[in-house]
Amino acid sequence: MTPSTPADDAWIRSYQRLLPESQSLLASRRSVIPVAISRVNQFDAARLDVEMSAMLKEQLVKVFTLMKPGMLFQYEPELDAFLEFLIWRFSIWVDKPTPGNALMNLRYRDERGVVAQHLGKVRTGLEGPGLTSPQKIWYCVASVGGQYLFSRLQSFSAFRRWGDSEQRPLARRLWTLVQRIEGIYKAASFLNLLSFLYTGRYRNLIEKALKARLVYRSPHMNRSVSFEYMNRQLVWNEFSEMLLLLLPLLNSSAVKNILSPFAKDKSSSTKEDTVTCPICQVDPAIPFIALPCQHRYCYYCIRTRCASAASFRCLRCNEPVVAIQREGVSSGK
């Protein structure tokens, strides 16, 4: 008895019958790969963004230095909101990382859109779509608009003195409501901070509400660790501390006397140089001359130098000054 020969398309029918089952098995096994993002990098990125905003604000304020003093103070919330909007517009809105995130190799990923996809390809756990347009808009509204409204509300309530006891009941209730909302927000932020330290996800409440998680842009990033700046800073700090220790011990007049012969030739001195006091560089109000070189000084300048140094030398000719006398007087010290 010979076995029956299978039909030519039997393997095709078997493949089509087993394909849904195999795909379901693969999909069940290919869940989202857990990936750990450095908490330090995320905090550093936030700090860099804050410093970038401060630098932009400092440069923008310099434009209005010649205008009325204090004019920008009343518009400071609008200025901060404008700068934050610019950073959002040219980074998150166009699917680019913020300056801090770019330096830390981070980007925003929509956690709700992370699904098992690209079957058969090698995955690192960093795949996933970026933020959607509604997420970007809500991020701007919450971060830029929310911060601006709260800052304006605080300044307005303080100016209107809502917290005073003699205010109207409505103002008091509004002030109490604002304080309660602020307290609830701070408590929620603290709980979110504890959750972030434990899980490494969502630095603030805005990211948590929008499911916008920071992940690495590239799975492999070359970290070029350089201690050149740190070494330079340490050397400069030690050098400056040494100078601060030694400078009070040095005699400035003695150093000038040592360096004056090398500064310029004696023949290059003009008539104006011989008239002015070589110490304060002005015309002496009470002119005195140094003996025996006969060079003019202010009385206070040369008297102070002679009292502070036992062997004071003339700053013009480097000759020892043995006595001083008022100009036009035959004798005196």
UniProtKB/Swiss-Prot annotation:
Its main location: membrane. A zinc finger (RING-type) spans 277-318. Zn(2+) 1 binds at C277, C280, C298, C301. Keywords: Membrane, Metal-binding, Peroxisome, Peroxisome biogenesis, Protein transport, Transferase, Transmembrane, Transmembrane helix, Transport, Ubl conjugation pathway, Zinc, Zinc-finger. It is found in: Peroxisome membrane. Residues 66-71, 159-168, 251-333 are cytoplasmic. The chain crosses the membrane at residues 39-65, 72-97, 132-158, 169-199, 227-250. One of its GO terms (molecular function) is ubiquitin-protein transferase activity. Zn(2+) 2 binds at C293, H295, C314, C317. Residues 1-38, 98-131, 200-226 are peroxisomal matrix. One of its GO terms (biological process) is protein import into peroxisome matrix. GO terms for cellular component: cytosol; peroxisomal membrane; peroxisome; plasmodesma. E3 ubiquitin-protein ligase component of a retrotranslocation channel required for peroxisome organization by mediating export of the PEX5 receptor from peroxisomes to the cytosol, thereby promoting PEX5 recycling. The retrotranslocation channel is composed of PEX2, PEX10 and PEX12; each subunit contributing transmembrane segments that coassemble into an open channel that specifically allows the passage of PEX5 through the peroxisomal membrane. PEX2 also regulates peroxisome organization by acting as a E3 ubiquitin-protein ligase. Component of the PEX2-PEX10-PEX12 retrotranslocation channel. Interacts with DSK2a and DSK2b. The three subunits of the retrotranslocation channel (PEX2, PEX10 and PEX12) coassemble in the membrane into a channel with an open 10 Angstrom pore. The RING-type zinc-fingers that catalyze PEX5 receptor ubiquitination are positioned above the pore on the cytosolic side of the complex. This is Peroxisome biogenesis protein 2. The gene is PEX2.
